[in-house]
């Protein structure tokens, strides 16, 4: 059953979603990017039209985004609509933000739950992969130990194909995190182009990596994600042809000891 606060917010947004009431709506956390927020009654997501469509947004993903942008008013609204307080806590930068969102007593998300997202949930849809991407790349509270676990899981997945490994290595050397590269890789592998477009928007410099992975799988749809010159695309095509030509038939050992060694910095 919806809480009294949720019912009040719904009534306010339905009665006062007019231009002259934007100050009230902003104060109540019902406006984002100059648009009024509605809770979809069909999919339980969030939208700007009060109508269900494929533009409805996942509440947890939206919550992560607004906390990163420091909009605690909207964050409170999303929490009242059922967004995950556990994930909200991972994105709070200090105790003041936790207190403002009443998250002091919320349990931390266990490491294995985040790892489970990395290894399974991203296959569901674009939004699930974006949640994984936000958790690993934009959360301030993911522990160093968890990042190492994630690093090990990623490396154990990719090292059996040295062509893929070499492509990762080129961009890892440019100071992109392994988890960022891996999320881009998954978006292309599972053809989650909406997620890919949003991730590349956050890290524009990673676009050539997306092209290289796309060409590795003969997927030229990736080039439509963002505009590039013909020369940029041709350069990526030639580079991946060279990488596949040199490494294409080489495979690594897959035992645990070798995977762990490969995950250390001297192999990257």
UniProtKB/Swiss-Prot annotation:
This protein's record includes keyword Membrane: yes
Localization terms from the record: Host membrane
Organism: African swine fever virus (isolate Pig/Kenya/KEN-50/1950)
Main location: host cell
Taxonomic superkingdom: Viruses
Transmembrane stretches, start-end: 176-193
Described purpose of this protein according to its UniProt entry: Plays a role in virus cell tropism, and may be required for efficient virus replication in macrophages.
Record membrane topology: Single-pass membrane protein
Up-regulation conditions: Expressed in the early phase of the viral replicative cycle.
UniProt family annotation: Belongs to the asfivirus MGF 300 family.
Name by which UniProt lists this protein: Protein MGF 300-1L
Any one GO cellular component localisation term in the record: membrane
Spans within the Cytoplasmic topological domain: 1-175
Keyword vocabulary terms for this entry: Early protein, Host membrane, Membrane, Transmembrane, Transmembrane helix
Residue ranges, Extracellular side: 194-268
